[in-house]
Amino acid sequence: MPDVVVVGSGPNGLAAAVILARAGLTVEVYEAQATAGGGSRTAELTLPGYRHDVCAGAHPMALASPFFRAFDLAAHGVELLAPEVSYAHPLDGGTAGVAWRDLDRTAADLGRDGAAWRALFEPMVRHWQQVVDLAMSDLRRPPADLLTGLRFGLRVLEQGSPLWNLRFREQTAPALLTGVATHAITPPRAIPAAGAGMLLATLAHAGGWVLPRGGSQAIPDALIAELERLGGKLVTGHRVESLDEFGGARAIVLDTAPAELLRMAGDRLPDHYAKGLRRFRYGGAACKVDFALSGPVPWRAPGCELAGTLHLVGTRAEAMAAEKTIAAGQHADRPYVLAIQPGVVDPTRAPAGGHTLYTYAHVPNGSARDISAAVIAQVERFAPGFTDLILAKNVVTGAEMPTHNANYIGGDISAGAMTLRQFAFRPVPRWNPYATPLPGVYLCSASTPPGPGVHGMSGLHAARHVLRTEFGIHTDPLDLLRTPNPA
């Protein structure tokens, strides 16, 4: 039996596994699916030669998170491609908000709100590493840079409150910010959504939202290659039924949802902790629709053709109304649709002349409805003629999401509702959210701080506790990652 068993091969599980292996421990990773990668996988879902990302498609954190800055994906063979436009937000009438990687260019395009956009983001972009370090922390200690933390916090409070329109005079800039805040799958005028929006929009102007050449699978593949180089082992197609399977391991690290911990632990968990896990709420879901296309999407608004990611919902008011409908358990007639067009930078995703379009729409948790018609209508709204380009499509409803990734309960790709309480206390109120009451058993999924995203930081924080508590190793995980070629 190895020193450590990791259950789940998503980016957090693999991040923990690599850190623990770099510390000299023997590590085995078990994955229920036939392929590894969790929320960062790529497959031919529509037609041969059309490669689609199964969940995560654009990666703001691949260049930014402390884990990936130390691991250095490029040094491990991953080519990260940055579109000139990180994201765009088309509006009716053929206009769009365009988040260029260049902050000044973005502000120049925003008319009367350009100065407000620059004032909102310039201090954040200038100190982007400190912003990321704060947002990607375990939320249990004060920020190292108090001034940047204060500036960021005040901006989040503003955008998460009734004051959110105070600095804006037109519709484009607030829509551009709301589109990214709505990644949280919650009404965007809320603190957790505002925090996500401020962080991701900052990164749009600080390195960009990169796409790995060949697909998101390149990220877990690089982590797996490093794990195996260090002597670690990956086992796919193995659904863990009970923690008792690994009784000889000194530590078990779970890149799983709280519901999976409850299942695998059986009656071993103390009542108070088990009740806390059962109270953990899962939020709105995603209905994923992937398209194989005969050509590029014919966006009406200039700038959209250069964007890696687009948010299709309309104005800030329309986004708020759509998300309130989802939160009430109903389907929106015009749902929020997130679209990614990898072909703007990566021609390997489709045969010559072809393109892929990744989309998902927000739906109520557990929804079994195929809403591809509503998705197509939202794309067609801003790109007339899109329908004529569709060669094939693949739909995964919210209810079907857990069959692809067991952490997405009811289709919740955030692995837990992004409420204010669950923003700080994931999955239960504990000073150490990674340790469970079971000796040697830890959680490292997106259901722990800092939450969803391909960043590896939940895995890093959990690995730090495993090293210190179970093995008496106090070396900083980031130092382990920076050590060249450890034996």
Specify the residue positions occupied by each region the protein language model found.
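Mid-domain catalytic core of redox enzymes
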Residues: 236-350
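A conserved FAD-binding loop/helix module that cradles the flavin
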Residues: 446-467
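N-terminal glycine-rich phosphate/pyrophosphate-binding loop and immediately adjacent elements
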Residues: 2-130
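A glycine-rich dinucleotide-binding beta-alpha-beta segment and adjacent secondary-structure elements
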Residues: 170-185, 333-338, 385-449
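Active-site-proximal substrate-binding core of FAD-dependent oxidoreductases
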Residues: 469-487
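Rossmann-like flavin
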Residues: 92-191
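Flavin-binding catalytic cores
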Residues: 116, 296-297, 330-333, 367-406
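Helical element adjacent to the flavin cofactor pocket in flavoenzyme catalytic cores
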Residues: 200-241
